[in-house]
Amino acid sequence: MSTTAYPDTILIIDFGSQVTQLIARRVREANVYCEIVPFQSADEAFKRLQPKGVILSGSPHSTTDIGSPRAPQAIFDAGIPVLGICYGEQTMCAQLGGNVESGHDREFGRAFLDVQEDSPLFAGIWAKGTRHQVWMSHGDRVTSLPDGFTIIGTSPNAPYAVIADEKRKYYGVQFHPEVVHTPDGAKLLQNFVHRIVGVKPGWTMGAYREQAVEAIRKQVGSGKVICALSGGVDSSVAALLAHEAVGDQLTCILVDHGLMRKDEVQQVVEMFREHYNLPLILVDASDRFIGALEGESDPEKKRKTIGRLFIEVFEEEARKLGGADFLVQGTLYPDVIESVSFTGGPSVTIKSHHNVGGLPERMKMQLVEPLRELFKDEVRLLGKELGLPDSFIGRHPFPGPGLAIRCPGGVTREKLEILREADAIYLDEIRKAGLYDAIWQAFAVLLPVQTVGVMGDGRTYEFVCALRAVTSVDGMTADFYHYDMNFLGNAATRIINEVRGINRVVYDVTSKPPGTIEWE
């Protein structure tokens, strides 16, 4: 029997591709549960999850290099469908007796694929003899096939662009179906999980709610639970799930660390105490947090300090309650992914998430993380399932470390107050322009830079404020929002006129990658 809560699971083995997370998004959009695991732990994960099918990701590695990553032999011995994408196709061929070579013509970017044969992979999408746009990114290519495989699609520089062993249900594609630049890619992945693997589209937020509630009850038993409530969508959905699961065993704790947006603490208290009747304790720890952060400019130290203080405060409040056994957090799947290295060797961490890397090892409570398998848009769907209003579900993401990581350089009360006012004006302008729901995340950043200005007849020397706005689906990739210049001019004018301490406003036009959404 499978040890996962989801018997119909697709396992995605990550060989280090930058877009592996997009494979998971496409599979989830097909209402099928999947998990990403790094190739180093794929053997253990395969035994634990007992998946119905496996997808092998792309990779920056070359299959021809000595010691390059390989898929566990167990997946080929299990008699289940396997789809190899780019490097995944190449390692599957190499492991099953085919041949892969380097040094041939490379393909990067848009390419056109000619369908040579009909296949369940193409059913209802592509027909034999047709040509379709795909997105390629490869230097190596397959030069001979293992026994049982046939060519079902070709491109000018990839004669083995799509291959299939229909009997064993092994498929390989040299292109990337998970990216939007392959227009039919999502449908091809749906065909793999629905038609070929045979998994029905049963992964819904209604089903997840039932399973999550049951999992919380099983983990917690009769123990006391406290929930880290911030008022953001993630912690709020986690709190409502926990309350549905264990009722009066739960006490929510809202820590006012002095790093929240304008009026946010009061709004959260009113909503959860009065509307949802959740037991809520408000802890004013702003002096403690800001004192610990004062003068600290290293962003990693900021995050870890905030994570450590969060846990200290929760433990103290738990003792006041007579002890607590469990701590609920709104950790999401991207938090987990970004805090783990999938590329082998020493871990390369993008940045510590205060929910993950910032936690001290000797925490005295066990973590309950009911959302750690979900992407952000799935959390919003779950919030809707739980009855949260659309106006709340649609709120922009706000980081746990709060304004501290939107204030590069040393943190002071004065700088936080300046930033808080500028941010409130910016968001007000966005709402008045009717743009709030079109933007994934928008916020102000107070830079550790002062510039000369002129106000009235006097010279000023004040801070620079950067405005940030991005569009995204799940936070894994993002593009900057393309405002009308009149909007930016109006927002900048209001901020400079109404916020004492700022005399210059700039707009951030960096996408993710290469940047991250937050500045720190």
From Swiss-Prot:
Keywords: ATP-binding, Glutamine amidotransferase, GMP biosynthesis, Ligase, Nucleotide-binding, Purine biosynthesis
Catalytic activity: XMP + L-glutamine + ATP + H2O = GMP + L-glutamate + AMP + diphosphate + 2 H(+)
Protein name according to UniProt: GMP synthase [glutamine-hydrolyzing]
Keyword Signal belongs to the record: no
Species of the source: Brucella melitensis biotype 2 (strain ATCC 23457)
Positions of the GMPS ATP-PPase domain: 203-395
EC number(s) on file: 6.3.5.2
Glutamine amidotransferase type-1 domain sequence ranges: 9-202
